[in-house]
Amino acid sequence: MRQVVRFSLLFLPCAILSVVLIGAGVLRWALWGMSFGIDFQSGLIERLRIAPPAFSLVYTGTQSMQFFQDEQKVVFTVSSPGVLGERYEFLYTEYPTLRAFSEGAKKVEHLSVTLHAPETVYMRDTFSGAEGSTLSSASCFVHYFSEDVRAPGVEELRRVLKDVPSAVVQQVGVRAEHTFQVRVAAETAFPSSLLPEQGGTALAQSDAPDLVTPQGAVESVVYAALVRAYGADHVVRLAMDFVGSRFSHLLVRQALLLVLGALVLIFLYVALRFRWFFALGAIVALVHDACIMVSFMVWFGLEFNSASIAAILTIIGYSINDTVVVFDRVRQTILLDPIASVTTVLDRSQTDMLTRTVVTTVTTLLAALMLYVFTEGGSRDFSLALMVGMVSGVYSTIYIAGGCIALISRGKSGGQLLGL
């Protein structure tokens, strides 16, 4: 007969240990705060691409010329104040290549087209930084991608912007489009060397190593770093937006409501499948896991962002699965021996499931460990939070959920607990 491990002897010491760990995290948060990621801060969100120029447009007329481009055509509209002038449309089916387009554009007065790419490049492979723009004597670049063009990856852009504090780079959309999203917190201290010059004068004094830049300068710092790496004619700014502090606070509240909503649904599920005290034990264990993960992030200075929320929700699902399996064995053990005390039933059930718990946790930990070793940045922090959560999940299933049930059923047998 298998020897039963007396887990119940450590219910109280482990509960005290958990309170101390969580309390230490709360204390550090209260004294030094938490490092929130750009997801929960006000700041710049910019969508961009890095691509070579296909051609440039210059308009020297006295009227206003609007330029528009989509996936099928290029359109020029000439107008005066209060008067809509001529409209020139160049369909890609009629003007398939740069050469054909540049020849056709000669009929537009005061417009000059300068090619920067081979004449055989297809117009359908070109794109502009915005859907519409006003042309002037300054060059307006239109860019392109083709199979022979080397496009930078997300890791390369992260290296380019590594000196920009709080900059987060992600690839968005279809991978073949090579579109990136850059986020930078608004109130960030930038080294003066990163700040662009305006009219020959730097935005900051050279003897000031760091400063908090105004909101508009955040955009300039990111653009200057990209221009230094790729050149102004290769940086395509698709869209820019600033997220205010009010919106970022709303995201924090929504994240908290998301976690609370998940806990409520899990409580209802466990209560319907077992009994309310099982559900209470499960919820206490899940809240414990979430608090341990947050405390770990606070103590080790990890950034709390949307990936952290994903890690917490992942661990909540992982932990409740383990807890439900143990609770199911607890119910079976009670039906087999309704006279045994609740602590005895818990010890037997957890001993029976110990091998499964260890094997499942170790194999999942190995997967998370590989993610931690072979990635960097946000993915590495995510995997580290997962590993902490997995260890906490096993610990809480045995000592927190079990201890909660033992506390509720003091002096009762397993049969009395289930009303048998």
Swiss-Prot record:
Entry keyword Transmembrane helix: yes
A Pfam family assignment: SecD_SecF_C
InterPro entries: SecD/SecF_arch_bac, SecD/SecF_bac, SecD_SecF_C, SecD_SecF_C_bact, SecF_bac
Subunit-level organization: Forms a complex with SecD. Part of the essential Sec protein translocation apparatus which comprises SecA, SecYEG and auxiliary proteins SecDF. Other proteins may also be involved.
Protein's recorded name: Protein translocase subunit SecF
Single GO cellular component term: plasma membrane
Lineage: superkingdom: Bacteria
Annotated function: Part of the Sec protein translocase complex. Interacts with the SecYEG preprotein conducting channel. SecDF uses the proton motive force (PMF) to complete protein translocation after the ATP-dependent function of SecA.
GO biological process: intracellular protein transmembrane transport; protein targeting; protein transport by the Sec complex
Source species of the chain: Treponema pallidum (strain Nichols)
Record-annotated membrane-spanning stretches: 7-27, 250-270, 276-296, 309-327, 358-378, 388-408
Subcellular location: Cell inner membrane
Key words of the record: Cell inner membrane, Cell membrane, Membrane, Protein transport, Translocation, Transmembrane, Transmembrane helix, Transport
Topology within the bilayer: Multi-pass membrane protein
Keyword Transcription: no
Family: Belongs to the SecD/SecF family. SecF subfamily.
One GO MF term attached to the UniProt entry: protein-transporting ATPase activity
